[in-house]
Amino acid sequence: MATLTPRQQQIFDLIRDTIRNTGFPPTRAEIAAEFGFSSPNSAEEHLRALARKGVIELTPGASRGIRLKVTRSDSERPDQFSLPMPGVLQLTLPLVGRVAAGSPILAAEHIDRQYQVDASVFDERPDYLLRVRGLSMRDAGILDGDLLAVKKASEAANGKVVVARLGDDVTVKRLKKRGDTIELIAENPDFQNIVLHAGRDEFSLEGIAVGLIRSSGF
């Protein structure tokens, strides 16, 4: 395992803890603010150093495109989802592919397969995995083909990444609520945000994102 400088260890720990608490890594700007760096470019330099040492992987062009490749903690708790490991408690979760218009997201015809993941990586237990379609959440590190771990919920706090149903469509976006206005925010400037009005637009929450499995190998 690579030896990290004290500052690199602090940044690694911040990334790990942010993933545990929110399901997603911090942005460069958030890292810079946490450590008092003059700009996000300083955070980028530290991230590249961590990547060179092989402890993280960076996704080009994504502000939250940071993936942990190793665990550095006393408990050696995995921070990323992985294939099943012998002797580790596994969760069996349904993997949802394309969702047909007007039908429940966990309807049998939507289940591509059952998938096993290490239970210890979740602070909140997910109910299912959803295969992501498209790049509207690219800058949150959520890419086309990735598997989003989702906990069923009908309410969510501002800033959470959610699975929402809009009429007959299901989408993954970041939630922002202001009074009766609901905004579903894309994490990619090539996509428009969706603005809705409670009581007037057909909208419901299907769940909250609690983690991510990168698509490579699936």
UniProtKB/Swiss-Prot annotation:
It catalyses: Hydrolysis of Ala-|-Gly bond in repressor LexA. CDD domains: S24_LexA-like (cd06529). The keyword DNA repair applies. The record marks 101-102 as: Cleavage. The active site is at 136 (for autocatalytic cleavage activity), 173 (for autocatalytic cleavage activity). Gene3D superfamilies: Umud Fragment, subunit A, Winged helix-like DNA-binding domain superfamily/Winged helix DNA-binding domain. Keywords: Autocatalytic cleavage, DNA damage, DNA repair, DNA replication, DNA-binding, Hydrolase, Repressor, SOS response, Transcription, Transcription regulation. Represses a number of genes involved in the response to DNA damage (SOS response), including recA and lexA. In the presence of single-stranded DNA, RecA interacts with LexA causing an autocatalytic cleavage which disrupts the DNA-binding part of LexA, leading to derepression of the SOS regulon and eventually DNA repair. HAMAP family: LexA. This is LexA repressor. It comes from Cupriavidus metallidurans (strain ATCC 43123 / DSM 2839 / NBRC 102507 / CH34) (Ralstonia metallidurans). The gene is lexA.
